[in-house]
Regions:
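Beta-strand-turn-beta hairpins that frame and shape the catalytic cleft
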Residues: 43-54, 134, 138, 142-147, ...
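N-terminal, active-site-proximal structural segment of metallo-dependent hydrolase catalytic domains
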Residues: 2-114, 118-130, 291-294
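Solvent-exposed loop/turn segments at secondary-structure junctions
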Residues: 59-63, 91-95, 121-126, 146-147, ...
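Extracytoplasmic/secreted proteins, especially bacterial periplasmic and envelope-associated proteins
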Residues: 69, 73-76, 103, 107, ...
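Low-complexity, Gly/Ser/Thr/Pro-rich intrinsically disordered linker/tail segments
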Residues: 271, 295-297
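Active site of divalent-metal-dependent phosphoester/diester hydrolases
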Residues: 67, 97-101, 115-140, 161, ...
Length: 297
């Protein structure tokens, strides 16, 4: 498995301050704003509970149903949804003309005042030697501190698109939750099953409570979802109403975007948000995390 990204300065500071070793992730992704005390529309916290609103959103590199690139529109959808942690799929980073070579992950983080980590599943040479690398993948936005992160490349046969599993340990008012974000292969069940198998292995190693966000490109009755829900709970089944279709945005007919959690996380409400900002609709879920610094053990 790939190593975690952990800046040395943060470790040294922690050792000097505490004279001990913290046996977990001890870093954050690049901050893009201070952690707020609260947010309008976010779930209300009561004593002993740690509510967390999360969302999964395939943003189609900012191109909406009108075929127009409009990243501000994506930002407004996220903002209006009130999610404190958001998993984004199909995110460009200096990728090309289709997204005007913008680092979309950083742009959205700065626009929303959130922290961000980005997982590059495609990492291509620039068109000119002095330009940034052209990248495409997934991102996690968070209003809470990100203490560490990594991106794992998933199985890919020859000729297939490289997919990945981005994960971040997020500190939510003293509790840690491990947030995963993925986007599985769209045209091969065999590939998705192989990718799900590796995801289950990685998720199963988590000491913390787990939230898996993503465009899984599989419907609820599929073998892929049957496999992953042996380990994680489908929050739409627990807290959603209706079919929960997320694709496509113009004529929703399939539920392929998910929020899945470990059994110690409670889903209180789930909704699909109407939007024309992408070809997918975002799914937003209110969760309650368990107490304790590290969640499950």
């Amino acid at each position: 498995m790939p190593k975690l990204h952990v800046p040395i300065a943060r470790i040294v500071a922690a050792v000097l301050a505490l004279l001990t070793v913290v046996p977990l992730l001890v870093s954050s992704g690049p901050p893009a704003g201070a952690e707020p005390a609260g947010q309008a529309g976010a779930p209300t916290e009561t004593f002993g509970q740690r509510p967390l609103r999360v969302a999964s959103f395939n943003i189609h590199h900012g191109v909406g149903t009108d075929n127009l690139l409009d990243l501000e529109r994506i930002a407004r959808v996220i903002e209006d949804g009130g999610a404190q942690v958001v998993g984004l799929q199909e995110v460009d980073r200096h990728f090309g003309e289709r997204s005007q070579f913008v680092d979309q992950a950083t742009w959205l983080a700065e626009r929303l005042g959130m922290r961000v980590v980005f997982g590059a599943n495609l990492d291509l040479d620039p068109f000119t030697p002095d330009a940034p690398r052209r990248q495409y993948g997934t991102a996690i936005l968070s209003r809470h501190r990100i203490r560490g992160w990594r991106n794992t490349l998933l199985p890919r046969p020859a000729g297939g698109e490289q997919r990945g599993l981005l994960e971040a340990v997020v500190s939510v008012r003293g509790a840690r939750v491990r947030v995963f974000n993925t986007h599985l292969q769209h045209n091969s069940q065999e590939e998705r099953l192989a990718q799900i198998a590796q995801i289950r292995t990685i998720v199963g190693q988590s000491r913390e409570s787990v939230v898996l966000l993503g465009d899984l490109n599989a419907t609820p009755e599929s073998p892929e979802i049957a496999a992953i829900t042996e380990d994680l709970a489908d929050t739409w089944v627990a807290a959603g109403e209706g079919e929960g279709f997320t694709y496509d945005a113009e004529t929703p007919h399939a539920r392929i975007d998910y929020v899945l959690t470990s059994s110690d996380v409670v889903a209180k409400a789930a909704a699909v948000v109407t939007s024309d900002g992408s070809d997918h609709l975002p799914v937003v879920v209110d969760l309650v995390l368990p107490g304790g610094r590290f969640g499950r053990r």
